[in-house]
Curated annotation (Swiss-Prot):
Gene3D superfamilies: 1.10.287.70, Ankyrin repeat-containing domain. NCBIfam families: trp. It comes from the Eukaryota. It catalyses: Ca(2+)(in) = Ca(2+)(out). Residues 1-24 are annotated as: Disordered. It comes from Bos taurus. Residues 13-24 have a biased composition (Low complexity). Belongs to the transient receptor (TC 1.A.4) family. STrpC subfamily. TRPC6 sub-subfamily. The lineage of its organism: Eukaryota, Metazoa, Chordata, Craniata, Vertebrata. It is found in: Cell membrane. Residues 428-438, 509-521, 614-636, 696-706 are extracellular. Homodimer; forms channel complex. Interacts with MX1 and RNF24. This is Short transient receptor potential channel 6. ANK repeats lie at residues 131-160, 162-188, 217-246, 618-647.
Length: 931
């Protein structure tokens, strides 16, 4: 039987050879599927074939058909390789055998690759094509799993790391698992090594070609998998011990950071961003952390801080911060019952449920969300419903009542506030006491108390609504020996009530500072308003008291003289006479005048404090938020405004300061007059004649006209309209997301009443309740017991150290053992400290020794739902061009597999026919021999 030419040999000759037997039929069957890589127009030069060397038939139709098929195959190859293929010749360093091997690996010709790997011992499996890619890279790029597995069995295979990164980027899970089973990843060190570290070791493990790597030099497999949101691949890498190292602090001055910054600052910044992209990936957050909610919240805040530090990458960091926030919102959205919502909002549910009968969720995660401005998380319906149930604690029936009923409840609480306070003093654990401890009742009680305080401020000025009874140039006394200042500086009963309210509010603020700490207290702007209001009230009352004290001293001098009966008939000394003068004759720095001025400012701030409770209402809440944003815009605008204002004020003053008394008015002649004129010019209340001079100095006057006109154009037309545009933009931002903004502001208001304590409103909080005294005694007892235990523990440690010293002194065996045990304990302590720092990122594979708590079970359920939802969303995306290309590659690979199966079947059939023919030919011979 004639054999076909060598399976891997080039085509020779110009006419088709006639081959007999099964081999000819086998080659004919491959004529339509295994084509040459090129075909000339007339001649037939030596061409590489994909499969076994085909025999051509002599008919013109068959030759024409083959040419058309080859041209189609060639066009597909050009399309796959891109335009660069048309401008790059085949590498002269490659043999025809290597070219055929690379083509077979690229197009999924499994039979050829297997046969060449088995039979061609001189084949270089690391040979590269015109683009510098070897067979492994080509097979992975075209998703040929079987070829990848065949190549991975070869020793000294290069660029395995780049193939892994390529498979991760394309999401080929099975290929990734196959590559990870390679001996190079047995120890796990390669997974933690980036391409840049491999280059330092002069290793081409992650190299794409001789020029460098395919991906960024700092990208490790786990970082790339996190970037691509490949959950299954991330899980596989995590199980093999891969982790993403958190970048050092931005201001870190360690030797490693300094070296990277000096060598290439841009690469250092990009490596930090790539690491944070991996850490902020939902795939990595959900699979790597024991507490993904806590990790995501902390990371979102860290990224927001970096966005303000690294301005050049601000958008990247803000996007990553928002990605972490969206991840937390996604987990909250997947909750199906109250227990799961509580687990996300509180953290470890079991620990906090063990607090006692009066359990109230601590909402530790929600505190962080409010602190880090995760507004969508706080405003989520699941979170809001949980907050609403806590808000109406012990008053669940009031939640469904109408607004009229709620208003009546508020009115009843305001009227009966003294009675409710009395009940809570003596029976804090009664039913009424529990109702008073509820957040809603605390809010109503505090709001009613503050409303009464504002009413007192109004009533304190009610006697002057129709005008003061004593004119500024008049004096009035109750009796003949009384000084006028004794009547005006003494405190009325209304003012004494106001002082009691102010002292109560100061005490409440002191308790809040003690509870929260100074840093957290100053973080809230409303606390700054309260602090300013109370400080001004206190300064006003102190100044008023000083005026009263000085007047009392003068009055005591009068009272000590029994001969004085009527002050109007005697001449008083200077130290006494002043306190009997009319208001218009008082010193400008008189304590009572200062007190009245400060009191007026404090009253304005007190009424502005009403805005704090406006977020409780859906109608007024967005308006209050817009007002707060407007105030921020005004402060930003004031920087530019002050620069322009001061420039023109100093310029106009320098121009007109020499013309005092020579102008039609005093504008711009002094700094004070310059300020007044320019300030009121903003509102159109300054006159044009402010720049006119009475003398014939036209040059100065014309310059004044020009500067004054430029000022009005700049301030009124440009800057004021810019301020209006800024305010309008801020209001539109609030309006576009009004529901989220309002719910977030309302949650912040509610949260201030969720904490234990501050049950009694002002001024009833000044009287210590029996409950407070009881808790104070308990704390003192606990402190004293801890103090004695500390001394006792210190004595025990001293005794133990003495024993050890005696053991060393007398040479007792085991002293070295004790020292080794002590050093071991120290090492274990240091190790536990480091592990606690990394606990939020590392897996704790101790579920067999430490069974998971309820919180861990809940988080595991939520993470499963999140991963499944992410996979469903990914699968529901439309088929893109890359997926169509993958389908083509699969069809191409299937073609070669079918051909191999057909060839094998043909060989088996030919063998059966041969055996059958031999058997049939042997039967006549046996019959003849039998005869």
């Amino acid at each position: 039987m004639n054999q076909s030419p060598a399976a891997f040999g080039p085509r020779r000759g110009g006419s088709p050879a006639v081959v007999a037997g099964a081999g000819a039929r086998r080659n004919e069957s491959q004529d339509y599927l295994l084509m040459d890589s090129e075909l000339g127009d007339d001649a037939q030069p030596p061409l590489p074939a994909y499969g076994y060397y085909p025999c051509l038939r002599g008919t013109d139709s068959r030759l024409t058909h083959r040419r058309q098929t080859v041209l189609r195959e060639k066009g597909r190859r050009l399309a796959n390789r891109g335009p660069a293929y048309m401008f790059n010749d085949h590498s002269t360093s490659l043999s025809i055998e290597e070219e055929r091997f690379l083509d077979a690996a690229e197009y999924g010709n499994i039979p050829v690759v297997r046969k060449m790997l088995e039979e061609c011992l001189s084949l270089n499996v690391n040979c590269v094509d015109y683009m510098g890619q070897n067979a492994l890279q080509l097979a992975v790029a075209n998703e040929h799993l079987e070829i990848t597995e065949l190549l991975l069995k070869k020793e000294n295979l290069s660029r395995v790391g780049d193939a892994l990164l390529l498979a991760i980027s394309k999401g080929y899970v099975r290929i990734v698992e196959a590559i990870l089973s390679h001996p190079a990843f047995a120890e796990g060190k390669r997974l933690a090594t980036s391409p840049s570290q491999s280059e330092l070791q002069q290793d081409d493990f992650y190299a794409y070609d001789e020029d460098g790597t395919r991906f960024s030099h700092d990208v490790t497999p786990i970082i790339l998998a996190a970037h691509c949101q490949e959950y299954e691949i991330v899980h596989t890498l995590l199980r093999k011990g891969a982790r993403i190292e958190r970048p050092h602090d931005y201001f870190c001055k360690c030797s490693e950071c300094n070296q990277k910054q000096k060598h290439d600052s841009f690469s250092h910044s990009r490596s930090r961003i790539n690491a944070y992209k991996g850490l902020a990936s939902p795939a990595y957050l959900s699979l790597s952390s024991e507490d993904p909610v806590m990790t995501a919240l902390e990371l979102s805040n860290e990224l927001a801080v970096l966005a303000n530090i690294e301005k050049e990458f601000k958008n990247d960091y803000k996007k990553l911060s928002m990605q972490c926030k969206d991840f937390v919102v996604g987990l909250l959205d997947l909750c199906r019952n109250t227990e799961e919502v509580e687990a996300i909002l509180n953290g470890d549910v079991e620990i906090h449920h063990s607090g006692g009968d009066h359990y109230r969720p601590n909402l530790s995660r929600l505190k962080l969300a409010i602190k880090y401005d995760v507004k969508k998380f706080v405003a989520h319906p699941n979170c809001q419903q949980q907050l609403l149930s806590i808000w109406y604690e012990n008053l669940s029936g009031l939640r469904q009542q109408t607004m009229a009923v709620k208003f009546l409840v508020v009115l009843a609480v305001a009227v009966g506030l003294p009675f409710l306070a009395l009940v809570y003093w003596f029976a804090p654990c009664s039913k009424m006491g529990k109702i008073m401890r509820g957040p809603f009742m605390k809010f109503v009680a505090h709001a009613a108390s503050f409303t009464i305080f504002l009413g007192l401020l109004v009533m304190n000025a009610a006697d002057r609504f129709e005008g003061t009874k004593i004119l500024p140039n008049e004096t009035s006394t109750d009796h003949a020996k009384q000084l006028f200042r004794m009547k005006t500086s003494c405190f009325s009963w209304m003012e004494m009530l106001i002082i009691s309210w102010v002292i109560g509010m100061i005490w409440a603020e002191c308790k809040e500072i003690w509870t929260q700490g100074p840093k957290e207290y100053l973080f809230e702007l409303w606390n700054m308003l309260d602090f300013g209001m109370l400080a001004i009230f206190a300064a006003s009352f102190i100044a008023r008291f000083m005026a009263f004290w000085h007047a009392s001293k003068a009055q005591s001098i009068i009272d000590a003289n029994d001969t004085l009966k009527d002050l109007t008939k005697v001449t008083l000394g200077d130290n006494v006479k002043y306190y009997n003068l009319a208001r218009i004759k008082w010193d400008p720095s008189d304590p009572q005048i200062i007190s009245e001025g400060l009191y007026a400012i404090a009253v304005v701030l007190s009424f502005s404090r009403i805005a704090y409770i406006l977020p409780a209402n859906e109608s007024f809440g967005p308006l209050q938020i817009s007002l707060g944003r407007t105030v921020k815009d005004i402060f930003k605008f004031m920087v530019i405004f002050i620069m322009v204002f001061v420039a023109f004020m100093i310029g106009m003053f320098n121009l007109y300061s020499y013309y005092i008394g020579a102008k039609q008015n005093e504008a711009f002649t002094t700094v004070e007059e310059s300020f007044k004129t320019l300030f009121w010019a903003i509102f159109g209340l300054s006159e044009v004649k402010s720049v006119v001079i009475n003398y014939n100095h036209k040059f100065i006057e014309n310059i004044g006209y020009v500067l004054y006109g430029v000022y009005n154009v700049t301030m009124v037309i440009v800057l004021l309209n810019m301020l209006i545009a800024m305010i309008n933009s801020s209001f539109q931002e609030i309006e576009d997301d009004a529901d989220v903004e309002w719910k977030f502001a309302r949650a912040k208001l509610w949260f201030s009443y969720f904490e234990e304590g501050r049950t009694l409103p002002v001024p009833f909080n000044l009287v210590p309740s029996p409950k407070s005294l009881f808790y104070l005694l308990l704390r003192l007892k606990k402190w004293i017991s801890e103090l004695f235990q500390g001394h006792k523990k210190g004595f025990q440690e001293d005794a133990e150290m003495n024993k050890r010293n005696e053991g060393k002194k007398f040479g007792i065996l085991g002293s070295h053992e004790d020292l080794s045990k002590l050093s071991l304990d120290r090492k274990q302590f240091a190790h536990s400290k480091q592990s606690s720092i990394r606990s939020s990122e590392d897996f704790q594979l101790n579920s067999f020794t430490n069974p998971p708590r309820q919180y861990q079970k809940i988080m595991k359920r939520l993470i499963k739902r999140y991963v499944l939802q992410a996979q469903i969303d990914k699968e529901s995306d439309e088929v893109n061009e890359g997926e169509l290309k993958e389908i083509k590659q699969d069809i191409s690979s299937l073609r070669y597999e079918l051909l191999e199966e057909k060839t094998q079947n043909s060989e088996d059939l030919a063998e059966l026919i041969r055996k059958l023919g031999e058997k049939l030919s042997m039967e006549p011979n046996q019959e003849e021999s039998n005869r």
